[in-house]
């Protein structure tokens, strides 16, 4: 029964991977949020089946589901700005060594490396 529903959903969401992610998100919302009035009619079905049916029927806004999914994946911590000037000076001192770090194009440390081709034989990439 769910397979037919998944095929019906392909008309609304053609990408199966996207369908799986969005249907999973909606099923979790059905499971955790109180929607007892709407689920009573479909009580014998599990949340994934209900989610697929509602997506296939167009009862669910795909854009809203995507936005809800994106919001759920965002970090919830907020970065507080530095208020104290002394703190910012301390942080500068901690990272002063970074100006000494440099990136070069010198790969001489790879000279003694052994490279193996797909046949398992040694080869020199410079030749």
Curated annotation (Swiss-Prot):
Stored SUPFAM superfamilies: RPB6/omega subunit-like
Coiled-coil regions listed in the entry: none
Example GO molecular function: DNA-directed RNA polymerase activity
The EC number(s) this enzyme carries: 2.7.7.6
Keywords assigned: DNA-directed RNA polymerase, Nucleotidyltransferase, Transcription, Transferase
Single Gene Ontology BP annotation: DNA-templated transcription
Catalytic activities: RNA(n) + a ribonucleoside 5'-triphosphate = RNA(n+1) + diphosphate
Keyword Transferase: yes
Description of how the protein assembles with itself and partners: The RNAP catalytic core consists of 2 alpha, 1 beta, 1 beta' and 1 omega subunit. When a sigma factor is associated with the core the holoenzyme is formed, which can initiate transcription.
Function of the protein: Promotes RNA polymerase assembly. Latches the N- and C-terminal regions of the beta' subunit thereby facilitating its interaction with the beta and alpha subunits.
Protein's name according to its UniProt entry: DNA-directed RNA polymerase subunit omega
């Amino acid at each position: 029964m769910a397979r037919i529903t998944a095929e019906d959903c392909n008309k609304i969401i053609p990408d199966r991977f996207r369908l799986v992610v969005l249907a999973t998100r909606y099923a979790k919302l059905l499971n955790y949020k109180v929607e007892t009035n709407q689920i009573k009619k479909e009580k014998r079905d599990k949340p994934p089946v209900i989610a697929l049916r509602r997506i296939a029927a167009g009862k669910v806004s795909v854009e809203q589901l995507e936005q809800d999914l994106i919001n759920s994946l965002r970090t919830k911590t907020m970065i507080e700005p530095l208020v104290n000037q002394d703190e910012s000076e301390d942080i500068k001192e901690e990272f002063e060594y970074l100006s000494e770090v440099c990136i070069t194009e010198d790969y001489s440390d790879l000279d003694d490396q052994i490279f193996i081709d797909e046949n398992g034989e040694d080869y020199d990439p410079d030749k």
